Amino acid sequence: MTPLMHERVRNMFGDAGQTTGFAVQQLMYDDPGDLSKAVMVFRPSGGTAIRTDLGSEYYVLVDVVGAKDKRKDALSAVQRIVDYVQANPMADECVGYIQNMGAIPAPVLTEEGRIVFRLQFACTYGE
């Protein structure tokens, strides 16, 4: 079975070293039970109509959840990811053309003091 697009983006980011220092999760955030651990969550976020033999856009949401009181580290990771995608929009043939949607969004804080950035990407893919 072909991996889902959020799994392909996770693999692409992992291969490029963008997930280093993060516990990688899929679909939903699961508290690692350790405030010193940063987490990156990959999940699907909709897209355009999927038609046979035509390209479609698949949207992927990547939550970058920083360790407690490590806000600058989380922001640096977010900027590295955005820079990587801008410089390498066709680095992975399984992803197709990837681009960031909405740049870097305003962060939110969790009750525990973790900073969260929700990055969204559009992947144009077709066979």
Report residues per predicted region.
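Charged, amphipathic alpha-helical segments and their flanking helix caps
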Residues: 1-23, 43-127
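A short, polar/charged loop/turn motif at coil->beta-strand junctions and beta-hairpin connectors
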Residues: 33-36, 54-56
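A short, hydrophobic beta-strand-centered structural micro-motif
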Residues: 35-45
